[in-house]
UniProtKB/Swiss-Prot annotation:
Annotated protein name in UniProt: Endo-1,4-beta-xylanase 2
Glycosylation sites: N29
Keywords: Carbohydrate metabolism, Glycoprotein, Glycosidase, Hydrolase, Polysaccharide degradation, Secreted, Signal, Xylan degradation
Source organism of this protein record: Humicola insolens
Single Gene Ontology BP annotation: xylan catabolic process
Record-linked Pfam families: Glyco_hydro_11
Role of this protein: Endo-1,4-beta-xylanase involved in the hydrolysis of xylan, a major structural heterogeneous polysaccharide found in plant biomass representing the second most abundant polysaccharide in the biosphere, after cellulose.
InterPro entries, A to Z: ConA-like_dom_sf, GH11/12, GH11_AS_1, GH11_AS_2, GH11_dom, Glyco_hydro_11
Classification via Gene3D superfamilies: 2.60.120.180
Family note: Belongs to the glycosyl hydrolase 11 (cellulase G) family.
Active site (UniProt): E121, E212
Domain GH11 per the UniProt entry, residue ranges: 37-225
Pathway(s) per entry: Glycan degradation; xylan degradation
């Protein structure tokens, strides 16, 4: 999948509201993003959880913050998008998550975040659709945590959108061998494994359990929590 960047320095408004492509009504009208063909880019806090949402505007994609730590994404013939709920800043916390993830084509379900100094975009891939992102990245090693094997990869993005504008930066990947949609992710174990393979992190920005898609359709309904 083409990497999908979160350009999230500020919420970006869509010029006009359009009819919702899905029969999909926000559960919390005071805080949920309005139903539109493409949900406007945004980040902030909702019911005590940090959320982040970005789309390139292609296709039809709807992100909605639901009650508590839940969110939902529905997409059809979309371009690039990534979004979800979690925390800011990121830490080595153990994350519990669950729900539903059904991509028809390219899609990821991942713990997703960024650091600065160095600028790093990272993924712990728990499930994916038709494309394994490790196929175009450099393999660094394998380790075992949370009941399964994870393969570690690194890749470099040149002059691409980031949380700090257009920059060159590295992407770190842990990809679970056996896909799942629900369980615990010990982020400190991933951070330690990356460090052991010469992949240092910097100052943490946000850390979310994200749904990501590229030129695909599908839906997800995910909740997050910590121990």
């Amino acid at each position: 999948m083409v990497s999908i960047k979160s350009v999230l320095a500020a919420a970006t408004a869509v010029s006009s509201a359009l009819a919702a492509p899905f029969d999909f009504v926000p559960r919390d009208n005071s805080t949920a993003l309005q139903a539109r063909q493409v949900t406007p880019n945004a980040e902030g806090w909702h019911n005590g959880y940090f959320y982040s949402w970005w789309s390139d505007g292609g296709g039809q994609v709807q992100y909605t913050n639901l009650e508590g730590s839940r969110y939902q994404v529905r997409w059809r013939n979309t371009g690039n998008f990534v979004g979800g709920k979690g925390w800011n800043p990121g830490t080595g916390r153990t994350i519990n998550y669950g729900g539903y993830f059904n991509p028809q084509g390219n899609g990821y379900l991942a713990v997703y975040g960024w650091t600065r100094n160095p600028l790093v975009e990272y993924y712990v891939i728990e499930s994916y659709g038709t494309y394994n992102p490790g196929s175009q990245a450099q393999y660094k090693g394998t380790f075992y945590t949370d009941g399964d094997q994870y393969d570690i990869f690194v890749s470099t993005r040149y002059n691409q959108p980031s949380i700090d504008g257009t920059r060159t930066f590295q992407q770190y990947w842990s990809i679970r061998k056996n896909k799942r949609v629900g369980g615990s992710v010990n982020m400190q174990n991933h951070f330690n494994a990356w460090q052991q393979h010469g992949m240092p992190l910097g100052q943490h920005y946000y850390q979310i359990v994200a749904t990501e898609g590229y030129q695909s359709s599908g839906e997800s309904d995910i909740y997050v929590q910590t121990h």
